[in-house]
Amino acid sequence: LFCGLMLARKGYMPILLERGEDVDARTDRVARFWETGQLDPSSNVQFGEGGAGTFSDGKLNTLVKDTFGRNREVLRILTEFGGDPSILYVNKPHIGTDVLSRIVKSIRTEIEKLGGQVLFQSQVTDFVTEGEPGESRRIKALVVNGSQVLEAETVVLAIGHSARDTFETLLARGIPMEPKAFAVGLRVQHPQTLINESQYGMKECGELGPASYKLTWKASDERGVYSFCMCPGGYVVNASSEPGRLAVNGMSYHDRAGENANSAIIVTVTPEDFCGMETGAGTDQGCEAPGDAMAGIRFQRRLEETAFCLGKGNIPIQLYGDFKEGRVSEGFGGVNPAFRGGYAFANLRELFPESLSRAFMEGMEGFGTMIRGFDRPDAILAGIESRTSSPVRIPRDQGMESPVKGIFPCGEGAGYAGGITSAAMDGIKTAEEIIRRYSPLRPSRTVAKT
């Protein structure tokens, strides 16, 4: 989206192809999914206008080193289109799913006013290249929705971390990819007052806003265990995108007024783990380690299939004390559930190999020494958190280009970003390279900066 905006403002007329619906229709469809369990594989928490970030906490902080001002530019653009100006100066900027939805819509309108096009329910289903394998190949056209051929010499591949069918198509067409380490785990819910008291020394947060945390631990087997996408005053949501598979995520509104804090507690996994690792859904027998680009995706899918079965289509949940004992919970304790989507009690120990469960528990106990009560027995766990980052990387050179010329892998799905701000920064960087190479179709629009 940011790549398209930058190109449009510089006089280019980009065509944005979005497999899902516009943000308004998408929001309605996601709400129906949470209520009924009826999943649309093309328009859901992962796919549709704004991508996965639209249904998240809307965190805007990033660890990416930025010497070119792109981070500041992302925040400035967000305020230009409706974001609170405070995100320009607060330590941990946050925008919220409700505000981000409006901003995304406004950016799309701006792109269209400048001559760009945004086509919804338009999934790229194939890539047409010219040149023989092993020689200088380049993109020639895209196939949309299985039939429409769209000629293209320059394609920005910003597909997100969950476009598994697109990854499969890219691999089948000989576009290089490689497996990448990521992390998997469970969402944990605590009362927000517990986190406030630990961080502020008092249960009520006042003008400080609900407290957050960022925790890391090293397990006895040297695996990293850490909190991820912590959502103060938020909800755990069903974030599935494939039938028969289930994944969760965290989400907060702008006011972060929910009763609970939640975060993913995740354990690192590497390409060496993907092949032959036992999960509740069995072992992958078709893995071609160590360079099998799809191994991580198959690993994710096995975990998500197990989660779907454990919850019978609902989010499988368990109290932490029961997780340690390997028994199904019979009810809640002092933590009230805060979910979007149906949930059911299950034994989440059946999700993971024992090595990952052990590392998870070591991390939880360690975090209990940092935040008193973090490892309380009635903390609510939900699974599975499997979409923490892309399981693949699509190689690109210093000019942001794939070995297949004309394809520019970009953002989180390509393995070069991890969150809203870093993905937007990568989009801007990609646009800068395209602008450097090609002349615009119309005069550029200058935007006053503040």
Give residue spans per PLM region.
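Residues forming the flavin
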Residues: 1-450
